[in-house]
Structure formats: structure tokens, C-alpha cells
Amino acid sequence: MAEKAPPGLNRKTSRSTLSLPPEPVDIIKSKTCSRRVKINVGGLNHEVLWRTLDRLPRTRLGKLRDCNTHESLLEVCDDYNLGDNEYFFDRHPGAFTSILNFYRTGKLHMMEEMCALSFGQELDYWGIDEIYLESCCQARYHQKKEQMNEELRREAETMREREGEEFDNTCCPEKRKKLWDLLEKPNSSVAAKILAIVSILFIVLSTIALSLNTLPELQETDEFGQPSDNPKLAHVEAVCIAWFTMEYLLRFLSSPNKWKFFKGPLNVIDLLAILPYYVTIFLTESNKSVLQFQNVRRVVQIFRIMRILRILKLARHSTGLQSLGFTLRRSYNELGLLILFLAMGIMIFSSLVFFAEKDEDATKFTSIPASFWWATITMTTVGYGDIYPKTLLGKIVGGLCCIAGVLVIALPIPIIVNNFSEFYKEQKRQEKAIKRREALERAKRNGSIVSMNLKDAFARSMELIDVAVEKAGETANTKDSADDNHLSPSRWKWARKALSESSSNKSYENKYQEVSQKDSHEQLNNTSSSSPQHLSAQKLEMLYNEITKTQPHSHQAPDCQEQPERPSAYEEEIEMEEVVCPQEQLAVAQTEVIVDMKSTSSIDSFTSCATDFTETERSPLPPPSASHLHMKFPTDFPGTEEHQRARGPPFLTLTREKGPAAREGALEYSPIDITVNLDAGSSQCGLHGPLQSDSATDSPKSSLKGSNPLKSRSLKVNFKENRGSAPQTPPSTARPLPVTTADFSLSTPQHISTILLEESPAQGDRLLLDAELPAQCQGLAKGLSPRFPKQKLFAFSSRERRSFTEIDTGEDEDFLELQGARADKQADSSPNCFAEKPSDARHPLSEEGCGGSSSPPNTGHNCRQDSFHAVGEVQKDSSQEGYKMENHLFAPEIHSNPGDTGYCPTRETSM
């Protein structure tokens, strides 16, 4: 039974958290298995039929069904969960109600509380044209949208004007920009506000001084008898003019565009405010004579009157005054219409009143131009009373003139007022928008507001998914050198099970590349820089070499095998192909049942075995050269385990000979598939597969597909054996695996899938990496029949090979006790045992010999069956010339569906 996920973590999580992108076949299967689909928009779930979405195939939801790859799905939606058939869109959930209703009913309505611009953006996102809006909502939608677009256009123009102030092409750009902001943008800083207040005070002071200079009590008489300005007030005015001049020059020097500065209306007002003063000084100082002064005096008076224009400088600091000026400029059509109406009325009524009043004595309507004044003040409803008609006909004309004046003025005036109010509000909105934009820019620069795309967030989460936090104060000699914060899926015991269930076969090679070395003082931390997702082939090769070059450690006593952490395991999957050879009778040991055993890594073996191999991998490839692999058995067989430790070789001899002469014990081997599984647990060693040699092999084929040792590799070892006839293996009742079905026919080779697991011991239970050859593993060579004179045992590397059965750490002690109780049955339990049938002597290959002295004798797990006996049993018939042998390894309660997560799938080895 597989380990279950922690209760805090939901197994039905998003695709992006526990598995790699699924294959197209899984996506298509998920869509075809259900007629309905779940649409999650902003956290609000909607359920709709697929055929409803097919009504609008060119929209975003219509394209959802045609997306069969991971990339195309992420282009349409933001996330998805194939297990729940759910697709997530990070959009406004309220607007989606109207959009989904459009799919169902064909009627598109806009909600009353929805912003028109936001609803338009939602329509653009979902791929629906706004022309489908119903007539009841169309007018309101377009009116609001046009209004919002106009406001946004004006705001964009203002921002473009402000952002168009380029200072890069001039000298001292930074200083000039600061000075420009200081003088032109009062809201940019506190200093700018203070400077604006000082400027306003100078404007008010200059206006007051100009008014006081006209008082007779404060005036003085010059040498020509003409009144002149008070000297004290003249000094005040000079200071104000000096301030205005300095301000104007600084603006001009710091302006990014000089010509645009001259054309600005406010700058023209500033120039007119200071220019009359200098013209007056120039005229008075250059013309000292009386005659010249009399000629210049009137010109000087004109320029003195122009000083009053200084009051208009307040418009620079007043939004209302600016709005008035812009309103007059924008309302020139209405103002022209008003003037035209007044001119027509004045002409008509002044003519009528002239002909009505010209015959009266002492009349003031002496001519039509003289009557214009009366018509003007009458139509404007002012009525000074200095001129008025006296006759009856003149009074009637005057009454009609008043009514016409009210009607003529009343028509264009509201338009002008409306323009003023709208422009005033727009100015206020633009000021707030500018402040908001500037605040957002400052916040983004400070990092308080971060905008991130969903795909970028997913990529960053994948990069940061493996994190190791170093414990403070721990040394390298401590038991745990790094504290894993359990963010990495490789650290979860159930994570690989979820991976193998939720992804396709093609992605298996990338799932089991996680390395954790705990038998040395160094630990490979899964950091973001060296996470399995980013390890290159060279780095993986280096890691594997470091693992294989680790120095051997001393054995520990069996009672000291307390495993707080389960050691890392290396799972090697070897597919061996047997060639037909002479028929021999083999003795198979009795099967034993092991119950109450949890195996979390069996799913790894199953998914590795269940991978669909290509035709190239199914058949052995011809070698590039005659390279023969010889696996030699030792001739001496020690009797005891201690004697074996003293005399046995640390590992088996693996030689490679060239030429066709090496035909004895030749093994034909094909692509290796070694899966390095990062998991910890107690292990047992079993040697699987028939160790039969062939003395008459012609030309063994050998091909080796070199790949990264940490990546998934498959080894096909073809034993060539001349057999006259052999019965086929009976079909298994369990679901067979694609690569483990065996065929003992005469013409077809036998594929044997054997799982060898290499485990690294825990920190406190160091096992020999360069293990001695087990005693009972060597017993086979000594007790072989003369029919097997040249059989040789083989080993694949310098490290121990163990049959893979991962046991939960919580049940290690019980399992060891169970194995200790069965120590006396070692001679009767073997995974793949060979003996001579006529002598009735069994030479078992027990697991104790391969497992070393650190654990009690263990049963051959590759031959075991559980209490259900669901798989076909081993059949042995002494009366037959040949016999059938079946080797099965499976777990109880097999679930064939990937969604069933309670138990691990079956692992089967048939021979």
C-alpha cells in the first residue's frame, strides 16, 4: 500500500504544482470523458456544456476545446486542472456572467453597475464583438464608452505633453529638468510650492503698489509740474519687476522648447507684465527735454496702464482662471454666434428707433450710429437711462429690442457655461490623474507595486520550487547538514506517485532525476541554482561519478539499524532477453508471502516498466564492434558469511573481450535504463533472471545506448541458450506490463525485466558501497550441474545491487524480525534459482548473501506473492521434459486507473 499524502496537502491540486505538463493524449482524454466543463473565472465556478461553447467557435471559450497541448492551453486560459476538467481564467467574474449568458441564450446585455470601458475590455478578452449588444444596452454602452475614451484621450495628451519635455539634447539636462519642475510644476515638490506662493505674493504686492501710485496724496510733482510716482512705491515696484524678470528668464533658460515657450499664453502674459516698466524707463530717461517728454508722455501712460496685466499672472497658479481662458478659446464658435446675433439685433433695432424718434424735438437719436448705444444696452438688458425713446412707436421698438436681446443672449450663453464647467472638471481630473500616475511611478520605482504576468509567476515558482534552508549553527559533521523546508516535491514521499499518475509516459525520464547523497558528510542541496529542473547532462554525470566513487564504510550490526531517515536508493531496471538454448530443468524455490509491507517506490518501478518502448528498444541492436560482455563466477564458494568477507572479492569481475572468441557466458546487452530513485528505506538484495550460459554462441549482439547515469536507461541482456523446446510461460492473471512479458518459444527471445535497487545507507547505518560477493550468491556457481560448466555470475558495478522493495520506516523493525524468523528457510527461498533436476539438489540464491551482513536473511522479493495469490503461481512438473517458471512481484489491491491514488500499481517480472 502506498503512502498517502499529508492531510494538509490536497491531492487534487493544480497541474502546475506537482507534475510536469501533460501530454496531448491526456488533454484530449480529459475533454472527451465529460460532456461538461468547469470554467473558473476569478474564483467563481461555472459549469457549462461543451456544445454550448461550440456555438461561438472563434471566441476564447470556443477555442478552448481545440487546444490539445500544454502551450496552446496556456495561451487560452491561465491555468487548468485535467483531473477536475477545470479551466481557470483570472478575469472579472461579474462580467463573465453576461458573457456566459450570451453563449447560452444568444443575447448580450451589459450589467448596470459595470463600467462601460471595463466591459468593453472584457468583451475584447473573450473575443466577442460589441456589435452583439442588444439595443437596450447599446446606446448606454456607446455613450459611456465615448465619454470615457474622450477623457482618456485628453489625459493621454496631457501626459504626452508632460512626458514630451526632453532635456537630453541640451547641456546639463538633470539640473535644467529640476529647475523646470521647480518653476512650472508647483505640485512636484515642497520647494516648488513655496516658490509659487512667493510669486503670488509678489503679484499681489505689485498690483497694490500700482493702485496706490494713483492716489494724489501719495503722488509727487516733478520738475515739469506733472504728478510722478512715490519713490518708496517705485522701489517696491522695482523689486517686484526684478523678481518677475528673473522668474521669466529662468523659465526661458530651463525650458526644453524655446519656441513653444514663447508661444505659450501664460508666458506672453508674463512678458507683457514686465515689458511696460522697461519701456517706460527707457522713454523717460532718454527724453529729458520738455518737448520730447510731451511727445512721449502719452506712450508712457499707455504702458503704465498695461502694468495691470500683472494680475493675469495669477492664472498660472489658478485652475479656475486657466479654465476661463481655455473656455473662451474653445467656445469661439458660440462667442461668434453670440456676437453675430447681437450685431444683427443692434442694427435692426437702432434703425427702427432712429426712424421712430428722429422727428422729436431735442432727440438724442440723431443718427443710426448714435442709436447703436441704445440698442446695445437695451439688448443686453443693462439700461443706463442716459438715452431712451419718448414716442409710442419708439417705446414699442424698445420693448421688442429687450425681448429680442434676452432671447439672443440666452441661446449661446448656456453652451459657454457648460464648456467652462466641463473644462474645469476636466482640469481637476487631469491634475488628479497626473498625481496618480506620478504616485504609481514612484511606487513602482520603490518596489511597493509589482506587476507580474501569470506565466512569469509560474516560471518563477518552478525555479523556486526546490529550496533548502541552511540551519544556523550546524556543522558539516552533524547528521542533518541541511534543513529541508519541504517545498520540494522531491522531498515528499508521495510526490513521485502523484507525478507518475498525472503525467504521460514520455515525461518519466525527467521525473526521476533527483539526487540526494546522505552517506557522506556532504549533502547535495536542491537549491534554485542546482535544482533538478536546471541540471545539465554534464552536472548529472559529475554527480553520478561522485556517488560511485564514494569510499566504502564499515558494516554496522543488524541491531544498530535504526533508520531515522531512509537512505537514498538507486533503482536499475534491466530488461534481459534470453536466447533459446538446450532445455534444462530448474528447481524453483517455494514462494513466501510477505504481508503488512508498504512500498512507496513500487509506483516508480511500475511507471518505469510501463513506459512504452520504441521498436528500436524492443529488439536488440547490432553492435558497432564485436564487444562481448563476460560475467565470471568465482570458483571458490566460502561456507560462512565471515569467511566470505575475508576471502571473497569486493565485487564481481566484469570483463570485456574483443573478437568472436569470447563466446562463453556471453551476454547480449541492449540499451540500459537505470532510474536513480531518491528515496530512503531498508533494502534487500536479490539476483533476478536466469544465470544460464551458452557454450555454442555464434556471434552475440551487443549494443549499448549511452546516456546520463542519472537519467532513465534500459538494459536488455540477452542470454543465448540452446534449448530444444520450452513451454511458454502461462499468462498472468494480473495486468501484464509491456516490457516484462516472457516468451520461451523457440524462435522469439525472452524479455525479462528485473529491477535491481542500489541503496545508500542512512547516516547512522553505513553499508559497504564496495560490497563483498555474498556467500549464497556464489553458491550457485559451485553447485551447478555439469550441464552448466561455464555459468558465470555477474555484477553490474562496484556497488551493491539490491532488489527494490521500499519499506516504510515505521515498520522496519517488524520487517527485520519477520526476516530473522525466516533465517532458517534461506535454503528454500530464492528469486531466480537454478539447480539440477536429476540430483534433486537445490542451490538457492538467497537474499542474505547479496544483502551483506548488516541485515538478517531476507526472502527473495522478486519471487514473492502476497496473500491474495492473484498472479499465476509457479508450476513445476518433474514428469515434463521442461517446465514453466513464472516470477512475479506485485502489491495487493491493484488499481489500474491513474486516478486511484490509494495503492501502488503492480510490478511484475515474468520468466
Curated annotation (Swiss-Prot):
PTMs per UniProt: Phosphorylated. Phosphorylation at Ser-608 of the FFAT motif activates interaction with MOSPD2, VAPA and VAPB.
Residue ranges that the UniProt entry lists as topological domain Extracellular: 213-232, 285-296, 355-368, 389-395
Glycosylated position list: 287
Modified residues (Phosphoserine): 448, 608
Intramembrane region(s): 369-380, 381-388
Residue span of region Disordered: 1-21, 503-534, 685-740, 821-911
Membrane-crossing segments per the record: 191-212, 233-254, 266-284, 297-317, 333-354, 396-424
Gene Ontology molecular function: delayed rectifier potassium channel activity; protein heterodimerization activity
Description of its domains: The transmembrane segment S4 functions as a voltage-sensor and is characterized by a series of positively charged amino acids at every third position. Channel opening and closing is effected by a conformation change that affects the position and orientation of the voltage-sensor paddle formed by S3 and S4 within the membrane. A transmembrane electric field that is positive inside would push the positively charged S4 segment outwards, thereby opening the pore, while a field that is negative inside would pull the S4 segment inwards and close the pore.
Purpose of the protein: Voltage-gated potassium channel that mediates transmembrane potassium transport in excitable membranes, primarily in the brain and smooth muscle cells. Channels open or close in response to the voltage difference across the membrane, letting potassium ions pass in accordance with their electrochemical gradient. Homotetrameric channels mediate a delayed-rectifier voltage-dependent outward potassium current that display rapid activation and slow inactivation in response to membrane depolarization.
UniProt protein name: Potassium voltage-gated channel subfamily B member 2
Species this chain originates from: Oryctolagus cuniculus (Rabbit)
